[in-house]
Curated annotation (Swiss-Prot):
Protein name, as recorded: Caerin-1.7
Domain remark text: Contains two amphipathic alpha helix regions separated by a region of less-defined helicity and greater flexibility.
Function: Antibacterial peptide, that adopts an alpha helical conformation which can disrupt bacterial membranes. Each caerin displays a different antimicrobial specificity.
Source organism (scientific name): Ranoidea xanthomera
Signal peptide from the UniProt entry: none
Domain of life: Eukaryota
Pfam families, A to Z: Caerin_1 (PF07440)
C-alpha cells in the first residue's frame, strides 16, 4: 500500500537527509 511505499522512500532518503539536518542543528 501507500504507507509501505512511503516507508521505503523514507528509509532510502534518511541517510542523505540526516547529515544535512545534523549540520543545521
Amino acid at each position: 500500500g501507500l504507507f509501505k511505499v512511503l516507508g521505503s522512500v523514507a528509509k532510502h532518503l534518511l541517510p542523505h537527509v540526516a547529515p544535512v539536518i545534523a549540520e543545521k542543528l
